[in-house]
């Protein structure tokens, strides 16, 4: 909030207590611009701001700031406008420094916390939730694979047993069929079959070969052959 000259003239050191409040450990030095304004002939130089610090129970205690504002001569006149402006600017710059130091200290503390968490070793007792989930899923997968292997073995055994049983049944059925067929053949007597009217059949074939263009001349033989076949069926 101050000018470039005032920002270059400040030198402070700071610390952060347990409530993350910024404590100035060494006093703030006024900038050259503020000092020059306070050295004007109409106003005496301001008294430096003193800060007292102490330790209480091993922790930092808030600084007790005692500011002695410059007064005019023994006559008790009003403070000059230049001095008021310098004090006001000093207070504004001091507040800006406090805020900036607080932000820097907060970022450093967050970075240190993240670094300490990242550097912690992971032991057997501190397995993360994702690792526990992975272990559980791996065990479930192994259990399912074992169950599938057991079922596969069971089904293969059942299939082999069914195939053996079917082969035995086929063999038994084939033996029974051949045995029944043999018995049936033994009960049936063979019958001799002779051609009917074989003489007339030979004459008809000879007539057709000799007279291919006069087949009507063979009609008498055909009629005789038909009568012979009818008589054989009746007899």
Swiss-Prot record:
Residues 129-176 form a coiled coil. Keywords: Coiled coil, Disulfide bond, Host-virus interaction, Lipoprotein, Membrane, Mitochondrion, Mitochondrion inner membrane, Myristate, Phosphoprotein. Induction: Down-regulated following genotoxic stress. A motif (Cx9C motif 2) lies at residues 218-228. InterPro entries: MIC19/MIC25, MIC25. It comes from the Eukaryota. It is found in: Mitochondrion inner membrane; Mitochondrion. The modification Phosphoserine is found at residues 13, 31. Pfam families: MIC19_MIC25. A motif (Cx9C motif 1) lies at residues 197-207. The keyword Cell wall biogenesis/degradation does not apply. Residues 31-90, 106-132 are annotated as: Disordered. Belongs to the MICOS complex subunit Mic19 family. Metazoan Mic25 subfamily. This is MICOS complex subunit MIC25. The gene is CHCHD6.
């Amino acid at each position: 909030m101050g000018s470039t000259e005032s920002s270059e003239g400040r030198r402070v050191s700071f610390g952060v207590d347990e409530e993350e409040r910024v404590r100035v450990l060494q006093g703030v030095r006024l900038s050259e611009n503020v000092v020059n304004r306070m050295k004007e002939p109409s106003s005496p130089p301001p008294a430096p701001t003193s800060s007292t610090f102490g330790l209480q129970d091993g922790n930092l205690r808030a600084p007790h700031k005692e500011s002695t504002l410059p007064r005019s001569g023994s006559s008790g006149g009003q403070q000059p406008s230049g001095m008021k402006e310098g004090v006001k600017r000093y207070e504004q710059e001091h507040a800006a420094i406090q805020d900036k130091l607080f932000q820097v200290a907060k970022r450093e503390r967050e970075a240190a916390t993240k670094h300490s968490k990242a550097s912690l070793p992971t032991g057997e007792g501190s397995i993360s939730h994702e690792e526990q989930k992975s272990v559980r899923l791996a065990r479930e997968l192994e259990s399912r694979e074992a169950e599938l292997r057991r079922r596969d073995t069971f089904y293969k055994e059942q299939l082999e047993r069914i195939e053996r049983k079917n082969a035995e049944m086929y063999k038994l059925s084939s033996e029974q069929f051949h045995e029944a067929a043999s018995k049936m053949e033994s009960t049936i007597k063979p019958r001799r079959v002779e051609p009917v009217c074989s003489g007339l059949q030979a004459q008809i074939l000879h007539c057709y070969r000799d007279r291919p263009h006069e087949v009507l001349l063979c009609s008498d033989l055909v009629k005789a052959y038909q009568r012979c076949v009818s008589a054989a069926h009746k007899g």
